Amino acid sequence: MAIISSRAAGAEDPGQRQQKSSARRRESKLAFARAEGLLQPQAHPSEAQEESLRPRTLAEYIGQTELKEVLSIAIAAARARGEPLDHLLFYGPPGLGKTTVAAVLAAEMGSRFYMTTAPALESPRDIAGYLVRLKQGDVLFIDEIHRLPKVTEELLYPAMEDFRLDITVGKGRSARITSIPLERFTLIGATTRIGALTSPLRDRFGQVQRLRFYEPHELAEIVLRSARLLNTSIDRAGAEEIARRSRGTPRIANRLLKRVRDYAQVRGDGHISREVAAAALELFQVDPMGLDWTDRKLLTVLVEQFGGGPVGLETMAAVTGEDPQTIEEVYEPYLLQIGYLQRTPRGRVVTPAALQHLGYTAQSPLPVWS
């Protein structure tokens, strides 16, 4: 016996509607994830084009004026003596140009540049492979140097201080240490967590320099330079709009420039003006102070659940669902820099400036925009 459905032709059953609704939610989440990633200071694997935007000389390098002056003196002195640069350690939040500065130094010295990361140096043979092939004046750059394994770090001590590689030959009672002379080289380390470095390693660097967040006018110049390299039409007002939402970070500024360029090509005539930049970045949920949804969530949770603080890092992480290290290394530095968050002995506290930006009033515990 045939069974005839009473549903109208073409009508969706509840299962189909649920599948489509789930698909829309997944698409929405994916779109938000893409937008949220715009403000991550770490490099994305897809950002290979960033290499073409890097300055090659100190003269091309924009910002970090005091650091450039110190480094230019070090370069001139080393050249005059015919010696390699002293070992250098750069620290600061991600995305500020530590790798770029290291590459520029090598170029200015006319030296070969070798780059690696601490997590890639798992065993002594990994670091030994780099050290034995370095020639006079070569530069070895180790990113995330605070993550070096202890046994690898200890191999660096005589290499940095005496240009000697000590290796153990044999096992047990027959084991002996053999020293291999090394060419005089320059080690440049970079870290976002200078406090995580051991004193013996930190003390072996001739210079320890901090990279600061960039000023809006410096970022605007970086955006203008990158736009020229990308053959993108932009005026100064458009560059300034992108710059002020870039969290003081060149990597983010270049990333936002590329997304605004896409928006200008699809929704406009290809030229980036202040209005076009503002419209694009609002679409990507980047507000005028460079805050994204996660930044606002962190601040809002502090206000609405804890009266503005103080709140401990672990508590913040548990309530927001974010990793404590991510909060401390990705979100907090910029919120501290712009005066929206304070660290106290008892925990994190939201400032009046943050309350005003989020739309809170003194009379109401809830945000005006909620």
From Swiss-Prot:
Disulfide bonds: none annotated. The gene is ruvB2. ATP binds at residues 53-54, 95, 98-100, 161-163, 204, 214, 251. It catalyses: ATP + H2O = ADP + phosphate + H(+). This is Holliday junction branch migration complex subunit RuvB 2. It is found in: Cytoplasm. HAMAP family: DNA_HJ_migration_RuvB (MF_00016). Residues 288-370 are annotated as: Head domain (RuvB-H). Mg(2+) binds at residue 99. Belongs to the RuvB family. The RuvA-RuvB-RuvC complex processes Holliday junction (HJ) DNA during genetic recombination and DNA repair, while the RuvA-RuvB complex plays an important role in the rescue of blocked DNA replication forks via replication fork reversal (RFR). RuvA specifically binds to HJ cruciform DNA, conferring on it an open structure. The RuvB hexamer acts as an ATP-dependent pump, pulling dsDNA into and through the RuvAB complex. RuvB forms 2 homohexamers on either side of HJ DNA bound by 1 or 2 RuvA tetramers; 4 subunits per hexamer contact DNA at a time. GO terms for biological process: DNA recombination; DNA repair.
